[in-house]
Design a protein with these regions (language model features):
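Active-site-proximal region of nucleotide-activated glycan assembly enzymes
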Residues: 1-62
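C-terminal alpha-helical cap of glycosyltransferases
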Residues: 233-249
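Donor-nucleotide binding loops and adjacent catalytic segments primarily
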Residues: 27, 34-36, 62-149, 182-186, ...
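A donor-sugar binding/catalytic signature common to diverse glycosyltransferases
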Residues: 140-181
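Short, glycine/polar-rich helix-capping loops at beta-to-alpha or helix-loop-helix junctions
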Residues: 11-19, 157-158, 178-185
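A short, well-ordered alpha-helix in the C-terminal region of glycosyltransferases
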Residues: 220-234
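Short glycine-/small-residue-rich Rossmann-like dinucleotide-binding loops
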Residues: 13, 83, 111, 154-155, ...
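Short, hydrophobic alpha-helical segments
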Residues: 211, 215-219, 244-249
Length: 249
């Protein structure tokens, strides 16, 4: 649709290749097909605006959010989520990694599709008190405020992680259109805010290792959190609105 639009708003420079690169239409490591004339024309319309996020993101009270889930002030907490329907591979890996024993509290928003099955499996493990399973969480800002680390896919919601200043283990969905989740994840990883695990490599032991190594390195986790905050674009909605108003004049 880009050739038909007057502006194309992008969450990440990797999608639009940065404002400067967008003007040339080239991308780092781009395939030759991506440098076609129509793409170069489309690139002139790209604006790396960021993605608007809910106003409460990054502003919820951490102590209150933790009290809601019954998580202590000094506990480490990992948030796992995969979208409204959930992500089965993430769901299975999280339960395998943290269901029986865990170095941290876990908030797991499973999505509706897998929730009942995961609940039965968790009950079979004795319903461990450190594992907080929900089909969804509303307001989601509370879950973000309670967490120290996130395990998630790499769709548009990663901008909420940036706004909340949260480091992440990202598992891109491999069948997303044009594999855009891998592009998102690698951009965030290169910025120092995430570790990327390919979907085909994810299982319980791998997830436990990745999370365990990050939680055991608080300085690294803090640096990743700072890198995440640096990616945030809190004025994304205003920038998009300004561009649209300018076009309408």
């Amino acid at each position: 649709l880009a050739p038909l639009a007057k502006r194309v708003f992008l969450a990440f420079p990797i999608a639009g290749r940065g404002d400067a690169e967008a003007r040339s239409g080239d991308a780092p490591g781009a395939r030759p097909a991506s440098r076609s004339p129509w793409r170069r024309r489309a690139a002139r319309k790209w604006v790396v605006s960021g993605r608007p996020v809910p106003a409460a993101t990054g502003r919820a009270d951490r102590a209150g959010a933790r009290a809601r889930f019954g998580i202590g002030a000094d506990e480490r907490c990992v948030l796992v989520f995969g979208g409204s329907l959930g992500a089965r591979r993430l769901n299975d890996a999280a339960l395998e990694a943290f269901g029986s024993a865990s170095p941290c509290a876990v908030i797991h928003a499973s999505g509706r599709r897998d929730h009942d099955d995961l609940r039965r499996r968790l009950d079979a493990l004795g319903s461990p008190p450190h594992y907080h399973l929900r089909p969804y969480i509303e307001p989601f800002a509370d879950a973000l405020a309670a967490a120290d680390l996130v395990v998630a896919r790499a769709g548009g919601s990663v901008m909420e992680l940036a706004a909340a200043g949260l480091p992440a283990v990202l598992v891109p969905y491999p069948h997303a259109t044009a594999d855009h989740q891998t592009g998102n994840a690698r951009f965030i990883e290169q910025a120092g805010a995430a570790v990327v695990v390919p979907d085909a490599e994810l299982d319980g032991p791998r997830l436990a290792r990745e999370v365990g190594s990050l939680l055991a390195a608080p300085q690294r986790l803090g640096a990743m959190a700072n890198a995440a905050r640096a990616l945030a674009k809190p004025d994304a909605a205003e920038r998009i609105a300004d561009e649209l108003i300018a076009l309408a004049r």
